[in-house]
């Protein structure tokens, strides 16, 4: 199989005009997640576990998986175990950008030309409010018991305050019990611990894409649990015309595929409000998801870390804990923390509520590795019981500031004619920058992401969230006014410069519901979207000209897709090289595929192999 790929590369190098063709797959190269998800121990709903480099007879498969990584993989260490090397080599696709940011952070006076971070979901709008509250005398108490070992599930006084707080702010129909609460140093630790006790190594948990990419590491690094991706389309679906719409039918299909491919599926992850979409699921939707999990005896991990960051009074968030009856309470586990809603990402506090005594006891056993200092627990308890400050000072001002910041960013995006999901929760906007890509590929998305870095602003691109379609970016707006405005100015400059570098020479649009017409150059700005960029099986007649209502039930709160996209590029040498690069950087690929082995299969391709090896390592 390796030989076939290398022969194809050699032939492609000799005759670049000759391209292998194949019938269209159900998902194009622009609608597939990057292979980093496999490196990060995630599994796509359309990929077979353990699959190797695709053969030449499957060029569509090859191209749709090829995408560059965010940084170089360290060499294997003889001082570490196989697992240790795997952990050491684990890298997020955006690691290079955030490493550069850490070395070149913006500062108003010391480094005004430094990098501005609009990629990390942190609330930086309420430091003044928190400083005033956290420096009051009641926060400075030091009782002797705080200096001793606590209950590993958290001090009793904190678990009691958490239970009361969640009862009130989640509108629980009955008082929640402190004995069902576990407190750890962040929800990342809770994710890892829950996965450890409900799954065995190599088991899988369902999750819809796009999703907060760090969950891959949360579940995989310690527990070796896989994420099985259920890809959601960026096109309108369902009666309400929602984009990236999760349904029970899609969950059923994802579970069926996972089991057909041999995975043991143990659970489901739900985020509400969602990251990065900022969607809020209705109680009816949540009950449907939970009933699906119950039918299939799956645990449901519900992440509600943005539940208090809903800043539109007309929008209602309903916690799972507000339900009169949870379909399967023994397998439903709700997480919340202070990092997002209370703008305390550095004060690592995550809470778990579950009625499963078995799970609570098992997770608490792992608390010895994930505990919170006693003094911090006391401060958090004091904060949570100060309802007057929370209700009259913090929450109203935080929501007002979030709303104003979001309004500014979305106004700037509209000025750039950039579509986005119109939501009123969390602290980021999911923006559609597909029209700025020279071609609909994850390689091009990464080039645009690096172009933002060049302009000293770091964002998070869609492939970091395993988005199935390239060109989507998450823009965090919960930052101080000066940094936010300067960051958006840099984004605007980067996009204008990048767009000037792209010449759209041939694309199609649909005007007035009529037949396809040619569009090129500046004229394409009046077009809706290219039919060729729509996912396979989607009809291009769903979309009309910009500034007009979109057909097929697209709601008024949804984005309108605009402008012309270039057609999908032909499969070629770069796609194969991209795939080889991913395989080479995996943990044991080099051990299994050496130049000598390839020479044994076909001595003539040894030089080709070595040349590709050098290119892939660059």
UniProtKB/Swiss-Prot annotation:
Q: Which UniProt keywords apply?
A: Pyridoxal phosphate
User: Which stretches of sequence are listed as region Disordered?
Assistant: 11-54
Residue positions annotated to bind substrate are 122
Q: Which GO terms describe its molecular function?
A: pyridoxal phosphate binding; transaminase activity
Q: Which residues form a coiled coil?
A: none
Q: Name one GO biological process term.
A: biosynthetic process
- Give the modified residues of type N6-(pyridoxal phosphate)lysine: 340
* Secreted among keywords: no
Low complexity biased stretches: 11-26
Q: Which CDD domains match?
A: AAT_like (cd00609)
| Polar residues composition-biased segments | 27-45
**Hey, which family's this protein in?**
Belongs to the class-I pyridoxal-phosphate-dependent aminotransferase family.
Name of the protein in question? 1-aminocyclopropane-1-carboxylate synthase-like protein 1
């Amino acid at each position: 199989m390796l030989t076939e790929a290398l022969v194809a590369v050699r032939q492609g190098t000799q005759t670049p005009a000759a391209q292998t063709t194949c019938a269209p797959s159900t998902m194009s190269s622009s609608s597939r997640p990057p292979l980093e998800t496999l490196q990060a121990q995630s599994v796509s709903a359309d990929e077979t576990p353990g699959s190797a480099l695709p053969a030449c007879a499957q060029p569509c498969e090859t191209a749709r998986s090829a995408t560059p990584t965010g940084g170089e993989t360290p060499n294997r260490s003889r001082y570490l175990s196989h697992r240790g090397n795997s952990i050491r080599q684990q890298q997020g696709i955006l690691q290079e950008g955030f490493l550069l940011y850490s070395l070149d952070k913006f500062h108003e006076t010391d480094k005004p030309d430094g990098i501005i971070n609009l990629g990390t979901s942190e609330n930086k709008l309420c430091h003044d409010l928190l400083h005033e509250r956290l420096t009051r005398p009641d926060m400075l108490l030091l009782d002797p018991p705080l200096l001793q070992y606590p209950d590993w599930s958290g001090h009793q006084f904190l678990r009691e305050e958490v239970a009361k707080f969640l009862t009130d702010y989640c509108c629980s129909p009955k008082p929640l019990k402190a004995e069902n609460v576990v407190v750890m140093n962040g929800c990342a630790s809770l994710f890892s611990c829950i996965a450890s006790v409900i799954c065995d190594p190599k088991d899988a948990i369902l999750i819809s894409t796009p999703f907060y990419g760090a969950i891959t590491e949360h579940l995989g690094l310690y527990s070796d649990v896989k994420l099985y991706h259920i890809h959601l389309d960026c096109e309108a679906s369902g009666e309400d015309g929602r984009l990236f719409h999760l349904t029970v039918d899609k969950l059923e299909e994802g579970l069926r595929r996972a089991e057909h491919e041999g995975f043991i599926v143990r659970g489901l992850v739900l985020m509400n409000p969602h990251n990065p979409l900022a969607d809020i699921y209705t109680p009816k939707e949540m009950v449907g998801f939970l009933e699906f999990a119950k039918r299939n005896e799956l645990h449901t991990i519900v992440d509600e870390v943005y539940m208090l960051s809903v800043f539109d009074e007309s929008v209602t968030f309903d916690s799972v804990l507000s339900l009169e009856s949870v379909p399967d309470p023994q397998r439903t586990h709700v997480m919340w923390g202070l990092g997002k809603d209370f703008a305390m990402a550095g004060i690592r506090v995550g809470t778990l509520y579950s009625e499963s005594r078995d799970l609570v006891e098992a997770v608490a056993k792992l608390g010895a590795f994930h505990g919170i200092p006693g003094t911090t627990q006391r401060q958090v308890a004091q904060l949570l019981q100060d309802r007057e400050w929370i209700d009259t000072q913090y929450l109203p001002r935080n929501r007002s500031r979030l709303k104003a910041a979001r309004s500014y960013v979305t106004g700037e995006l509209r000025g750039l004619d950039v579509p986005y999901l119109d939501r009123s929760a969390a602290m980021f906007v999911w923006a559609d920058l597909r029209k700025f890509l020279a071609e609909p590929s994850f390689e091009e998305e990464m080039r645009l992401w690096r172009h933002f870095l060049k302009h000293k602003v770091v964002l998070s691109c869609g492939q970091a969230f395993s988005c199935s379609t390239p060109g989507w970016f998450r823009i965090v707006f919960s930052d101080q006014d000066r940094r936010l405005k300067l960051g958006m100015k840099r984004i605007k400059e980067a996009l204008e410069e990048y767009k000037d570098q792209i010449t759209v020479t041939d694309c199609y649009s649909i005007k007035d519901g009529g037949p396809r017409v040619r569009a090129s150059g500046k004229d394409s700005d009046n077009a809706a979207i290219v039919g060729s960029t729509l996912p396979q099986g989607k009809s291009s007649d769903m979309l009309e000209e910009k500034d007009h209502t979109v057909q097929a039930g697209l709601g008024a709160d949804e984005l309108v897709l605009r402008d012309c996209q270039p057609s999908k590029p032909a499969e070629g040498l770069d796609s194969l090289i991209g795939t080889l690069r991913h395989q080479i950087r995996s943990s044991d690929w080099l051990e299994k595929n050496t130049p000598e082995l390839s020479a044994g299969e076909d001595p003539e391709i040894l030089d080709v192999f070595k040349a590709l090896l050098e290119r892939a390592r660059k």
